[in-house]
Every structure is written in C-alpha cells, then in structure tokens.
C-alpha cells in the first residue's frame, strides 16, 4: 500500500491497515511525504502553546515501529513521482494530502502586503520550511484577524500574548524573535456572523483570561443577544461556547499592555492600503465601519489543491465513501473537507481502510518490482533518518528547556538526516 501524506490521516490509515494484517494477509505500508519531516499539521499547524495536542505524535511513532512500515519523506508525489507511477507499483494508493491552501475572502485588497492567510501565518510561526522566509511585519499597532474558529483564535492569542510565554515552546526561533519585537498592542478578532454561530471551542475560550498581559474584551450585550436567539435544540457545544464568552464579557478589566477584542456580525468588504495593509472596511449590519489595521490574517478555512488533476467537489476530492477510482482512495480533509479535530481522522481513516480491505480481498496482489528504481535519483529520507532529525531537534531543545528547536530549512533537515551536519 502507498499512502501519500504523513499527517494524522496518513498515520491513522497506516494503523488501520496494520490492524487488518493476519497470518494469511500482510499489508506493507509505504508512507510518502513531500517534506523531510512527517506529522503534518501536528508539527506545522498546532499552536506552540498547546503541547498536549502534539503528544499524538507518540502514537505516530508507535505506528512507524511496525516492521512492514516504511517512510519516504522528502519525496513529492506529483513532482518527483507521478500518481500513475504509484498506482502502477502498489495494490492501492491512499491520498491523505489534506487541504493545504488558505481560503480566500474574495474581496479587494487581499493581495496587499502584510495580509496573510492563516495557512501561511500558522506555518510561519511553526517553522514550516516553505514559509520560513515570509516577511511578516509586526511593527504596527493593530492586527485584524478574520475568522470565528480555533485557528483564528490561535493566531489572535499568539499576537496578543506576552512573547515570554512562548520561550519554552517549539515555536520557530525566527517567529519568536519577531514576536519579541512586536509593537502590536490591539488585536481585533472579527467574525462575519453573530456569536452563536462561532466555531470556537469552550476550552480554548476559557484559556483567554489567563493571558496576564492582555485584556480580553467581549460585549456582554452581544453574547446575551446570542443566548436569546438560541433555538431550544442548540447543541451543548454552542451553549458551552456562549457561556465561556459570557464569563469573559463579565470580567472587570484593569488596564493592561495589550487588548484582544472580539467583534461579531462584521462582514469584511475591502482591505485598503497603498501597497500595504492600512485599514479594513466592514459592514456591521447597521452601516459601514473602517478599522485601521497594520496586519490582517484571514482564518476562514482551507482549500483543496486541485493540481492533482482529480475532480473536486465542494472543498474535497470527489469520492464515494473514500473511493476515488479503482485502487485510489482518499482520507481526511481531502476526503470530507477541512472539518473536525485530529481524532476525527482516526474513525474516518478506519472506515475508508475497511472498504479498501474488502475491495482488495476480491483481487490478487500485484506482482511488481517496487519503487526503488523510481527513487534512485531522489534523496528520500527514511524512518531512521527522520528519527535522526527528531533526536537532533529534541536534544537542542533540552539545552534551553524547550520540547525541541526545529530545523528551519529543507537543507538543514536533509543534512542532519544524512549525517552531513
């Protein structure tokens, strides 16, 4: 089996395949990843001040210990290898490629300097090698974050918090340096819909009052109005969200160094500026408002990469319960769209792999030579080489009381992996 994409959906697919192995049937799993490092958004998407979420990486490493598991990192399917070449060399191919691009608002001004998608901004502060050179300018006074989910909250929280709270995390060194120099004092978190439709989760909201250097401001009138508008069948998570926001709204505020303000029901119409972000025009439902801004981050979701040449439906590859076409399957966000938490991918992958297993029981295994000839001109990073990177980063982190100090460039990663550093 070939799995493309070494994020949670890819690893959980490998785990599901391993669970179907028996004395009669053995699944050999090759996991391909375009970066030199696996783990996907667990490495490059989870906020650095949320280390508990990253602990799922221990599960991934246990999955990797299976003798029939191989990692081929630093190999980009679609560039280094074609999808057709994989399909010719494996009994089945599973795409676990996620939805890597930030969704666009589709309004004027999105291409101005210092307007970023959350996909870019989060990858930047998490040390993704493809985003390490972004020229993110934190020298202004106000940042506007547009979105109403946990990613938007992560971005707003990191911009509003005291950077000293990030010193013992695995945030990228360059992002930590920039946040230490940041002049941003006011962060607006702007949601297009009213508070009852926000996709935050209550635990993340409850963390916000712990920001000792930051006043968190939510209108109690807005939250009480949202509570009044709730239908009787509203889910528990919605009520928990509103209760958490109401608790914040009721806090007394002493003057602090920074403010994080929630604004609901404000629809962005235009990002304005002369070559660079200067303000954002919103429709508040009662008229237009112009908010001065020096940085804009849009966090309204992610989009599928259509360069695979596969049909896209909505925001995922067209599929029938995970089957795209004969011997080609899809899991995770690429299957269902960018929804759910890390654990959602486990059940999702298990369902698709069960179907794959049943499909393969009706066929004879392919007699192929393997992919080594296809890889002979490439420089794949295998499991032991990835673990060399991992050990190097963790060892460097121990010197400064951090979980790890990430290598920032593909070259650095390859050099360490190959023992050339």
Regions found by a protein language model. Give the residues of each.
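Rossmann-like nucleotide/phosphate-binding core characteristic of flavoprotein oxidoreductases
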Residues: 1-4, 16-30, 45-49, 55, ...
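Glycine-rich Rossmann-fold phosphate-binding loop(s) that bind the pyrophosphate
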Residues: 5-9, 148-149
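Dinucleotide-binding/catalytic capping subdomain of oxidoreductase cores
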Residues: 21-31, 153, 157-285, 356, ...
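Helix N-cap at the beta1-alpha1 junction of Rossmann-like dinucleotide-binding domains, i.e.
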Residues: 36-37, 194
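Conserved N-terminal/central alpha/beta ligand/cofactor-binding core
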Residues: 37-38, 42-92, 110, 217-245
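Short, conserved active-site loop motifs that form the nucleotide-linked donor/cofactor pocket
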Residues: 68-70, 115, 260, 328
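Glycine-rich dinucleotide-binding loop and its adjacent helix/turn
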Residues: 102-181, 314-322
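Glycine/Thr-rich phosphate-binding loops of Rossmann-like dinucleotide-binding domains
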Residues: 103-104, 125, 197, 306-307, ...
């Amino acid at each position: 089996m070939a799995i493309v994409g070494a994020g949670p959906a890819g690893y959980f697919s490998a785990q599901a395949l391993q669970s179907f192995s028996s004395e009669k049937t053995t699944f050999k799993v090759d996991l391909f990843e375009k970066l030199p490092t696996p783990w996907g958004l667990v490495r490059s998407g989870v906020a650095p001040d949320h280390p508990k979420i990253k602990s799922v990486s221990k599960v991934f490493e246990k999955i990797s210990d299976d003798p029939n598991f191989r990692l081929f990192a630093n190999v980009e399917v679609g560039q280094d290898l074609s999808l057709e070449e994989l399909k010719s060399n494996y009994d089945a191919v599973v795409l676990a490629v996620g939805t890597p691009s930030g969704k666009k608002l589709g309004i004027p001004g999105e291409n101005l300097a210092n307007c970023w998608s959350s996909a870019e901004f989060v990858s930047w502060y998490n040390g993704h090698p493809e985003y390490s050179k972004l020229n993110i300018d934190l020298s202004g006074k106000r940042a506007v974050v547009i979105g109403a989910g946990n990613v938007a909250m992560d971005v707003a929280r990191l911009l509003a918090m005291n950077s000293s709270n990030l010193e013992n995390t695995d945030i990228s060194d360059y992002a930590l340096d920039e946040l230490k120099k940041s002049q941003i004092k006011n962060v607006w978190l702007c949601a297009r819909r009213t508070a009852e439709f926000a996709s935050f989760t209550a635990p993340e909201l409850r963390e916000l009052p712990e920001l000792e250097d930051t006043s968190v401001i939510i209108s109690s009138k807005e939250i009480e109005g949202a509570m009044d508008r709730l239908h009787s069948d509203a889910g528990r998570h919605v009520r928990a969200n509103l209760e958490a926001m109401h608790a914040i709204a009721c806090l007394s505020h002493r003057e602090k160094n920074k403010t994080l303000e929630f604004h609901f029901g404000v629809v962005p119409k235009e990002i304005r500026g002369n070559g660079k972000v200067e303000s954002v025009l919103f429709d508040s439902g009662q008229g237009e408002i112009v908010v001065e801004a020096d940085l804009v981050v849009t966090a309204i979701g992610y989009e599928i990469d259509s360069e695979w040449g596969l049909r896209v439906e909505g925001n995922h590859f067209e599929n029938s319960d995970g089957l795209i076409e004969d011997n080609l399957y899809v899991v995770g966000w690429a299957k269902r769209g960018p929804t759910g938490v890390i654990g959602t991918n486990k059940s999702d992958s298990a369902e698709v792999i069960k179907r794959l297993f049943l499909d393969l029981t009706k066929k004879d295994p392919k007699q192929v030579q393997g992919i080594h000839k296809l890889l002979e001109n490439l420089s794949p990073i295998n499991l032991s080489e990835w673990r060399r990177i991992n050990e190097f980063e963790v060892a460097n982190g121990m010197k400064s009381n951090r979980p790890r100090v990430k290598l920032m460039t593909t070259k650095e990663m390859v050099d360490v992996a190959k023992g050339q550093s």
